[in-house]
């Protein structure tokens, strides 16, 4: 394991958060779900259910796409399946963005506008940012909670004990998600200017030729990863550009999780950290997920 270098920011997190809020940064309360552009409904849902154990918990049909919410290891994902994939074909399936709860949608709109961040979709009760000024991420904002308010699910969300003890992957929840960017300093400047964050650690990862900064954003840890030379991060950026690279789950037993995937014909690969294994996009309907023992 590569030693982590503390930024020294954590002890002053509350004070720094107050200062950030005063200068117009967005205070996110809770992550709601991670958004994925999927190529097809039946095959993606079958894979997510059979291999990852996903629950199909909400259906949102529409004229442009079929959207659904699925629950995997304590994390909600929204899958958007376009009626026709032609206009998405060159880019392929990918992580579109991530939704956070905020207290005031109107104030958040104003904060984004003041930073020259436009909206690509606004349905009133929620909205998505333009990806280009947001490091390739369409951030979505919502002023309610899927987790702490009543909601009419197709079936009840399975509790943490089920994912930890009853499912063979042994999920312990979301560990972090990673964002790959070509320019590390510019990426950190964006997050510092846009959101209330608490920087936790910095480290170099020579085995992936990557530079990493980890920070707390609401109830999630985000890892910003940039290339330091030729390697998997550089290749990822050449193919997909800036944006969400991977979602990392904690698991009770990494060997047991690997055995589960092997039973489905999937061999896990080395992840972006020395203690993670990954299911690669080619084996996971176009998106990378990682697993780390906790």
Regions found by a protein language model. Name each.
Residues 90-97, 108-110, 239-245, 257-259:
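Short, solvent-exposed interaction modules
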Residues 80-82, 99, 103, 111, ...:
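A structural feature that tracks compact, well-ordered secondary-structure segments
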Residues 2-45, 93-100, 147-188, 244-247:
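N-terminal beta-strand motif that seeds the catalytic metal site of vicinal oxygen chelate
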Residues 19-21, 80-85, 160-164, 227-233:
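Short amphipathic beta-strand starts and helix->beta connectors
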Residues 20-29, 35-76, 107-114, 120, ...:
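Core segments of cupin and vicinal oxygen chelate
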Residues 2-25, 109-170, 213-217, 223, ...:
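Vicinal oxygen chelate
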Residues 77-82, 87-100:
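A broadly used, surface-exposed interaction patch
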Residues 206, 231-238, 243-250, 264:
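Accessory, usually C-terminal, subdomains that scaffold auxiliary metal cofactors
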